[in-house]
């Protein structure tokens, strides 16, 4: 997979892309990550990439020319059109399902904005997707693109050492992940649930499933509205409600 990031601040990505899972994914050649400063593509004699908005108003607006030219340069040798993703607070809310969708692409280009916003022609005639990571405002799209890139890359084949871990992560099953415990079994009087040390894998799996359901119900009940519960899950959910 190939991922390109269009940004005015390429140095922001050095530490993130050179560490942890993203570093390992590149070493395994599961993904090629490129960070491109789209200022290098401007034709402005002042080397600018933004201008005042027509009609007046506060702030500066990113001009279309350098972003269009950068995308055209990055895609000139490919037959298949890539997904071009605009990072912005007006976009579709990013979810695990969206991460899985993007992970199936051969080439994704993230466009990171800054200043007041983008010229609308970038939205209308260039990008294929607009993504937001939450209902809050960031200085630019860089941090958001890092979040999405990390979420997508870890889904690529061979990137994670334990594929089971990936499947059991929060949101992958539509539920939040169950609690985890490790040694010691008794820490300052706080004990690990007996079932986890019983060796009975059927009971352990059942406990984890039920606790995932409990955690989802108490912390993110909205997720249950989108999920078709099994009969067993419905039974557990009734017990969970009675326990509260």
Curated annotation (Swiss-Prot):
This enzyme's EC code(s): 2.1.1.228
Residue positions binding S-adenosyl-L-methionine: 113, 133-138
CDD domains xrefs: TrmD-like
An annotated Gene Ontology molecular function: tRNA (guanine(37)-N1)-methyltransferase activity
Primary residence: cytoplasm
Enzyme class: transferase
Pfam families recorded: tRNA_m1G_MT
Any single GO BP term: tRNA N1-guanine methylation
Compartment list: Cytoplasm
Gene Ontology CC annotation, any one: cytosol
Keywords from the UniProt entry: Cytoplasm, Methyltransferase, S-adenosyl-L-methionine, Transferase, tRNA processing
InterPro entries xrefs: Alpha/beta_knot_MTases (IPR029028), tRNA_m1G_MeTrfase_C_sf (IPR023148), tRNA_m1G_MeTrfase_TrmD (IPR002649), tRNA_m1G_MTases_N (IPR029026), tRNA_MeTrfase_TRMD/TRM10 (IPR016009)
Record field: catalytic activity: guanosine(37) in tRNA + S-adenosyl-L-methionine = N(1)-methylguanosine(37) in tRNA + S-adenosyl-L-homocysteine + H(+)
Description of how the protein assembles with itself and partners: Homodimer.
Role description: Specifically methylates guanosine-37 in various tRNAs.
Family matches, as HAMAP family: TrmD (MF_00605)
Family: Belongs to the RNA methyltransferase TrmD family.
Protein name: tRNA (guanine-N(1)-)-methyltransferase
Taxonomic lineage: Bacteria, Bacillati, Bacillota, Bacilli, Bacillales
